[in-house]
A protein has these predicted regions:
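Conserved class I S-adenosyl-L-methionine
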Residues: 20-65, 78-79, 101, 179-186
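C-terminal alpha-helical "lid/dimerization" subdomain adjacent to the S-adenosyl-L-methionine
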Residues: 28, 45-48, 163-221
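Class I SAM-dependent methyltransferase SAM/SAH-binding core
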Residues: 68-122
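A short acidic, Gly/Pro-enriched loop at the edge of an enzyme's catalytic core
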Residues: 121-133
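A short SAM/SAH-binding and catalytic strip from SAM-dependent methyltransferases
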Residues: 132-144
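A short glycine-rich, Lys/Arg-flanked "PGG" loop and its adjoining helix->strand segment in the class I
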Residues: 146-161
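C-terminal lobe and adjacent flexible extensions of AdoMet/dcAdoMet transferase-like proteins
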Residues: 223-229
């Protein structure tokens, strides 16, 4: 931080330190990373969830889910209690340890959830299997987020709904600059999270039609309602 402040005082910019190719996330790295932090994951994100207000954003977005629901990269199951009562829910994640936590959360809330270990980039479901496909705070860690989004599109029914809550570049210049400067540090400290991505660009690149989108919490969290084209 001292070097950044010093550079700013001298009128110089501090260039971002990009993520080295050798440290790019792979499916195996992603699984191992989240297996290691599974039992502490909810503590690690407590501030974002409860102080910044991410819980409120989850609730508002997921209240729109209907029918047969797929939760992609469900993690420890934080979305589970937020779906409408009586929903038919399938939840998948690459990390078996995260799914163990999700199973405990399902028991806690008295819900019967179909849980499966699965790679978001290779969903093992037939085309058009779900009325609603959900993913929250996940595209920022997928090795190939566009491929994962294309898979979500594939398994969503043509008239279905895709609901996303994602990290992204802020529309506030000072904060966007901070995100860029600290891209690599954040990536290292937050399990491979690329917090300065452009979620809308990823969604559109995957051939998904955006119905509504909204920036939240200083423009860093994007709520997106979309459907397959």
């Amino acid at each position: 931080m001292k070097s950044i402040i010093g550079a700013e005082k001298k009128g110089k910019t501090c260039p971002p330190r990009r993520i080295p190719l050798s440290e790019k996330m792979t499916a195996s790295k992603l699984q191992n990373t989240y297996d290691e932090i599974a039992d502490q994951y909810e503590k690690k994100i407590w501030f974002d969830q409860h102080i910044l207000g991410v819980v409120r954003l989850r609730k508002k977005l997921l209240s729109k889910a209907t029918g047969n629901i797929l939760d992609v990269a469900c993690g420890t199951g934080l979305n589970i209690p937020m779906f409408p009562a009586g929903s038919d829910i399938t939840a998948v994640d690459l990390s078996p340890k995260m799914l163990e936590q999700a199973h405990q959360n399902a028991i806690k809330y008295g819900l019967n959830i179909n849980l499966a270990v699965m790679d978001a980039e290779h969903l093992e479901f037939p085309d058009g299997s779900f009325d609603t496909v959900v993913s929250t705070l996940s595209t920022c860690t997928f090795p190939d987020p566009v491929k994962a989004l294309q898979e979500m599109k594939r398994v969503c029914r043509p008239n279905g709904l895709i609901l996303l809550l994602e990290h992204g570049h802020s529309d506030l210049p000072w904060l966007a600059n901070f995100q860029d400067r600290n891209e690599y540090q954040h990536y290292q400290q937050h399990a491979g999270c690329r917090w300065n991505q452009d979620p809308l660009d990823l969604v559109q690149s995957a051939g998904i039609k955006v119905l509504r989108s909204k920036r939240n919490i200083l423009g860093m969290f994007h709520s997106i309602e979309a459907k397959p084209l």
